[in-house]
């Protein structure tokens, strides 16, 4: 599947805020956004008046970059969200949150969604006892995600177990036990991404 392969730190600078795409590095002085908190390029420090379309576009780009998704797949998520009952913008964020790579990240495996995606691709996880190596796989309520037995003994997963994260309300389990469960679909208040999904819906609705 296609993915962005350029300079990650430029994405945060372009959006004007930290997207925490590099995990722990984003909390250190090495963070490029902390050192140069303006847009990249020759005219990055100049201030421009942003149109309504520009604001909508920036929100879409921000969401794509947070979840590591390119345009074609992102539009597919929007179209699916629009077909579902309920609020389209919230449906969109819920679909993104229920991706396996994001759930793995939320459970504490990986310092970033990029690392979590790599772990999924390399076949480290089981969903309901079956190996799944597709990052975009949509998990469902009551699904159980476990680490493969062979992977539990690796230094990487031992490190994750020693540094557990606080889980969101819609997930349960513990990283030390190498298991997590999707208790329910996330509500909007459970999704802590700095995105105004209404602007994204307005953009695609034109």
Curated annotation (Swiss-Prot):
InterPro entries: Ribosomal_uS4, Ribosomal_uS4_bac-type, Ribosomal_uS4_CS, Ribosomal_uS4_N, S4_RNA-bd, S4_RNA-bd_sf. Transmembrane segments: none annotated. GO terms for molecular function: rRNA binding; structural constituent of ribosome. The keyword Thylakoid does not apply. One of its GO terms (cellular component) is small ribosomal subunit. It comes from Clostridium botulinum (strain Hall / ATCC 3502 / NCTC 13319 / Type A). Residues 98-164 form the S4 RNA-binding domain. One of the primary rRNA binding proteins, it binds directly to 16S rRNA where it nucleates assembly of the body of the 30S subunit. Part of the 30S ribosomal subunit. Contacts protein S5. The interaction surface between S4 and S5 is involved in control of translational fidelity. Belongs to the universal ribosomal protein uS4 family. The keyword Repeat does not apply. Pfam families: Ribosomal_S4, S4. Keywords: Ribonucleoprotein, Ribosomal protein, RNA-binding, rRNA-binding. One of its GO terms (biological process) is ribosomal small subunit biogenesis. This is Small ribosomal subunit protein uS4A.
